[in-house]
Amino acid sequence: MFDGMTAETLARMQFAFTVSFHIIFPAFSIGVASYLAVLNGLWLRTRDDTYLTLFNYWKKIFAVAFGMGVVSGIVMSYQFGTNWSVFSDKTGPVLGPLMAYEVLSAFFLEAGFLGIMLFGRERVGDKLHMFATAMVAFGTLMSATWILSVNSWMQTPAGYSINELGQFVPEDWWQIVFNPSFPYRLVHMVLAAYLTTALVVGGVGGLHLLRNRKDAPARRMFSMAMWMLIVVAPLQILAGDFHGINTLEHQPAKVMAMEGHYDSHPDGAPLILFGIPNPDEKRIDYAVQIPQVSSLILKHAWGAPLDGLDTIPDEDEPPVAIIFWSFRVMVGLGFAMLGLGAWAAWQRYRGRLYDTQLLHRAAIVMGPTGFVAVLAGWITTEVGRQPFTVYGLLRTSDSLAPVAAPAVAASLLAFIMVYFFIFGAGTFYLLRMMNAPTSKPDPELKEGPIRTAGITPTMQSDPDLIPGE
């Protein structure tokens, strides 16, 4: 199955496989945790039981997703010590403390308050329960902050020196944590998590509205999700624009691959909408493009010059085809999310938000696209950094542990089988929970006389139920 592949290729495949499974759960957990905090706060403020019903509905889904995220994340840490021990040795003085801070602060905060949030409402009081819910939401955001700081440092390293052993040594922790790409990546990822959650909530709400458009919790969750889409989707597009400009400054080869610019454009670069990258001929075949627009987007100036991959040595060039397509999947889905939010806003204005079945079906179809967009975005980010693990300083080929290809292949095959079984079952269970009714139906009254617990029959007013007649 993996014949002819090197240990480096297999190790990269293994990490890509495990991190792809992992990222979808934290992305969902971040959004759902904040959603639960909002629901709990609204219930405390209004005492509207619809919010409490939604809180109880989504907290169970959050618990399962959170657990799957924790389990899938453990595996990746072991790979740093097995397949990528050289990387761990060289970057450990910088990245080790950051990852420890994530555990000591964010994860402990989440773990400490999670039980109170899930089971403590009747035991600790409403206000303390609200505090616990807010702390879980804050913990997920803090966890994202530390992990994205680590990843951003690998993309745009700062605040370090290199000792005689070739290790990165911290010199300025402020520069390390708040490295040049960190603020943009943090905002972009958190907004992606909120969009992902809004799409899932909207899809679930749309499903239940198709079954019963009078379902009050379904109406509320669908309305909240559509508000989130129309507000956050434009912000995400704007954040992506700023992130792209920052990436052009610090990682120009990545942006050149994203845009498909093999050649430099001294008089302005076109925006290539679609095409087929041809790495052998260094061109985009069958390109559909709009003149000058790439320069306008990246430099906010019509006709501004843009360098191409012809200015990058071949050995430093990232895999263009993968980045080219993953970037377009991410951007295309982003605009589709904006379109869904705008459609919902129009139907809300017309007073038909809960009556337009086509909109509800579209929300169901769009439900999983947030996860696809997150995966496409991370493929763009991580593959675009190649051939480096620490951009411009440490190559991927120099980060690998001295492991044999058959050993990596065996562990990769084991991961594939175990992951699809365990996380497939977990995902199936999550889908069943989302398919369940938003609230328990009232027990149906049986036909016939209603009697008390005693032996005396109750008075009946229905002549059809009077015995003997």
Question: Each predicted region: which residue ranges?
Answer:
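Polytopic transmembrane helical bundles with strong interfacial aromatic enrichment
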Residues: 1-469
